[in-house]
Swiss-Prot record:
Protein name: 16S rRNA aminocarboxypropyltransferase
Keywords for the protein's UniProt record, in alphabetical order: Cytoplasm, Ribosome biogenesis, rRNA processing, S-adenosyl-L-methionine, Transferase
Primary location: cytoplasm
Organism, as annotated: Sulfurisphaera tokodaii (strain DSM 16993 / JCM 10545 / NBRC 100140 / 7)
Origin: domain of life: Archaea
Listed HAMAP family: TSR3
Described function: Aminocarboxypropyltransferase that catalyzes the aminocarboxypropyl transfer on pseudouridine corresponding to position 914 in M.jannaschii 16S rRNA. It constitutes the last step in biosynthesis of the hypermodified N1-methyl-N3-(3-amino-3-carboxypropyl) pseudouridine (m1acp3-Psi).
Biological process according to GO: enzyme-directed rRNA pseudouridine synthesis
Recorded catalytic activity of this chain's protein: an N(1)-methylpseudouridine in rRNA + S-adenosyl-L-methionine = N(1)-methyl-N(3)-[(3S)-3-amino-3-carboxypropyl]pseudouridine in rRNA + S-methyl-5'-thioadenosine + H(+)
Cellular localization per UniProt: Cytoplasm
Length: 167
């Protein structure tokens, strides 16, 4: 499955996981959206139903700083916008924070959800904390894997209710 990176050059180059994916030939740099655009502001959620699109046209990650990105920037990118369901960062900067994943964590999660588990694990192996991310989210990733959008939304709703203590 092709992975593309749009790099806004707003991250510390030494910590930029998108550039690492490109450097190690796990992703290709692009200036335009291709296929599925991972967009944290999207109402639609990535699911197994998106696998055909991802296989044909790839997945695009927008590599930017969480502190300097906006919904408007994502809206300008053409493609099929999807967000990831609730997952927790395993990276040292945002460890344990829901939804605040690094680019490489977003790629790993996307591949896992689309049932490309071997490829997800292969990419997790290129960073020290890749397996931390997988272990931290193992139960969630397995529950999202191979599921439809509605099934994932229901699982996510249940997880959020447990976290905030709603009945």
């Amino acid at each position: 499955m092709k992975v593309y990176i749009i790099d806004y050059h707003r991250d510390d180059p030494k910590k930029c996981t998108g550039r690492k994916l490109i450097k190690l030939n796990f992703a290709e740099l692009t200036r335009y959206g291709k296929g599925i655009i991972l967009d944290p502001y999207s109402k639609r959620i990535l699911s197994i139903l998106d696998k055909d699109i991802a296989l044909k046209t790839g997945i695009t990650i927008v590599d930017t700083s969480w502190n300097s990105t906006s919904k408007i920037e994502f809206e300008k990118i053409k493609g099929e916008h999807r967000r990831l369901p609730i997952l927790f960062a395993g990276n040292p900067t945002n460890y344990g924070i829901a939804y605040k994943l690094s680019s490489i964590e977003a790629v790993i999660a996307s591949l896992y959800i689309l049932n490309e588990v071997e490829e997800a694990i292969k990419i997790a192996n290129i960073i020290k904390w890749g397996h931390t991310f997988l272990e931290l989210n193992k139960e969630l990733l397995e529950s999202y894997r191979n599921k439809s959008e509605n099934e994932i939304l229901e699982i996510e709703r249940e997880v959020i209710e447990k976290i905030i203590g709603e009945p």
